[in-house]
Swiss-Prot record:
Keywords from the named record: Lyase, Magnesium, Metal-binding
Record-listed E.C. numbers: 4.2.1.113
CDD domains: OSBS
Protein name (Swiss-Prot/TrEMBL): o-succinylbenzoate synthase
One of the record's GO molecular function terms: magnesium ion binding
InterPro entries registered for this protein in UniProt: DgoD-like (IPR034593), Enolase-like_C_sf (IPR036849), Enolase-like_N (IPR029017), Enolase_C-like (IPR029065), Mandelate_racemase_C (IPR013342), OSB_synthase_MenC1 (IPR010196), OSBS_N (IPR041338)
Organism: Synechocystis sp. (strain ATCC 27184 / PCC 6803 / Kazusa)
Matches recorded under Gene3D superfamilies: Enolase-like C-terminal domain, Enolase-like, N-terminal domain
Length: 320
C-alpha cells in the first residue's frame, strides 16, 4: 500500500511586472498555489499550481477545493490519477513528488538556454525599443490580433526596421485572427524572409484552437512556420495533433499540461520541434519547466521565458 505524503499548500498573488495584453484580454496579476509534499523520512518537494483558465485549465477556486479535499494527505497513486481535469494540479503534485524523490527536478543547469524578450503590445513596443537601446536578448515576441490589422501591420513594419539585424522575431496572435487576416500576415512575413534584417521565426497560434484544419492549410500554403499554442495546451491535444501529422512547431506550456514525468516520457518517444513557454509562474515552476526544456527544447530556439536579467518572482504566502 502506498504510504501517503503530508500535504501543505498556500496561495500567492502578485502583480505582473508589466501587464500582458493579448487577444484574450488584459492580464495584470498572477494568482496560484504552492504545494509542498513531505514523506515519512522528511524528504520534501514543492510544486506550483499556476492556472490559465482561458487556455482550458482549472481555475484557482477548483484547484484550491482539490487541495483542501486532500485533508493534508495524498498517495502516489492519487497523484497519478489527478488527470486532465486538473492539469495544473497534476503538474504541481507530480513535480513536487519528482523533486522529493530525486532531490531536484533540475538535472542540468538551464543557463545554457537562450531566452525570449516579450515586447509590449501595440505602439508601446516602439517606446520600449527607444528607451532600451542595449537589448539583452536576440529573440523577441510581439503580440498581434489585439487591434486593427492595418494599424498592427504598420507598427510591425516600424518595429522590424528598428530591431537589430540578425535577431529573431516571433508574432503571437493567441488565436485572435481570422483566416483572411492570417493569410495577409503570412504573405507579409513570407516576403520579409527574402530580405536582410531581423528574421521572422514563426507566427504563433494565428487562429482559434478549434480551426485546426484551417491551420494545417496555412502551414502548407506559406513558407513561414506556424506554431501551435492554445491548440496543444494539454498532453491529449498534443498527442492528437502529433498523430494527425502537424508539421509546424509546438509551444509547450508544461506548467499547465499535467504531470511532468508523463510529459517527459511522451517526449522521449515522440520527437517534435518543441518550444517551452512560460505561464508567468514563480521561480518554482519556472525552474521545473526549464529542466524539461533543457532536454527537449528545439536547439537554437529560445525558450518562451523572460531573460534571466529580469526579476523572477519568488513564491511567498499570499498576504492579500
Amino acid at each position: 500500500m502506498d504510504k501517503p505524503y503530508h500535504v501543505k499548500f498556500y496561495s500567492y498573488n502578485f502583480p505582473l511586472p508589466k501587464p500582458v495584453v493579448t487577444a484574450h484580454g488584459h492580464w495584470q496579476r498572477r494568482r496560484g498555489l504552492i504545494v509542498e509534499l513531505t514523506d515519512q523520512r522528511g524528504n520534501r518537494g514543492r510544486g506550483e499550481i499556476a492556472p490559465l483558465p482561458w487556455f482550458g485549465t482549472e481555475d484557482l477556486a477548483s484547484a484550491t477545493d482539490f487541495c483542501r479535499s486532500l485533508k493534508g494527505r495524498i498517495t502516489p497513486a492519487q497523484i497519478e490519477k489527478i488527470g486532465d481535469r486538473l492539469p495544473c494540479c497534476g503538474f504541481a503534485f507530480g513535480s513536487a513528488e519528482w523533486e522529493l524523490e530525486s532531490g531536484s527536478v533540475i538535472e542540468n543547469s538551464p543557463n545554457s538556454l537562450s531566452y525570449c524578450q516579450l515586447l509590449p503590445t501595440g505602439e508601446a513596443a516602439l517606446d520600449y525599443l527607444a528607451s532600451n537601446p542595449q537589448l539583452g536578448a536576440s529573440t523577441f515576441k510581439w503580440k498581434i490580433g489585439v487591434g486593427d490589422f492595418a494599424v498592427e501591420r504598420d507598427l510591425y513594419g516600424q518595429l522590424w526596421r528598428r530591431l537589430p539585424e540578425g535577431c529573431q522575431i516571433r508574432l503571437d496572435a493567441n488565436g485572435g485572427l481570422s483566416v483572411d487576416i492570417a493569410q495577409q500576415w503570412l504573405t507579409l512575413l513570407d516576403r520579409q524572409r527574402e530580405n536582410s534584417g531581423p528574421k521572422i521565426q514563426y507566427l504563433e497560434q494565428p487562429l482559434p484552437p478549434g480551426e485546426i484544419d484551417e491551420m494545417f492549410r496555412l502551414q502548407e500554403d506559406f513558407a513561414t512556420s506556424i506554431a501551435l499554442d492554445e491548440a496543444v495546451c494539454s498532453l491529449a491535444q498534443l498527442a492528437q495533433l502529433y498523430d494527425k501529422g502537424w508539421s509546424g512547431l509546438y509551444i509547450l506550456k508544461a506548467a499547465i499540461m499535467g504531470n511532468p514525468r508523463v510529459l517527459n516520457h511522451w517526449l522521449k518517444t515522440h520527437p517534435i520541434p518543441a518550444i517551452f513557454s512560460s505561464v508567468f509562474e514563480t521561480a518554482i515552476a519556472r525552474g521545473q519547466v526549464l529542466a524539461l526544456a533543457q532536454k527537449w527544447n528545439l536547439p537554437d530556439h529560445a525558450v518562451g521565458f523572460a531573460p534571466l536579467r529580469e526579476p523572477i518572482t519568488e513564491a511567498t504566502p499570499d498576504s492579500v
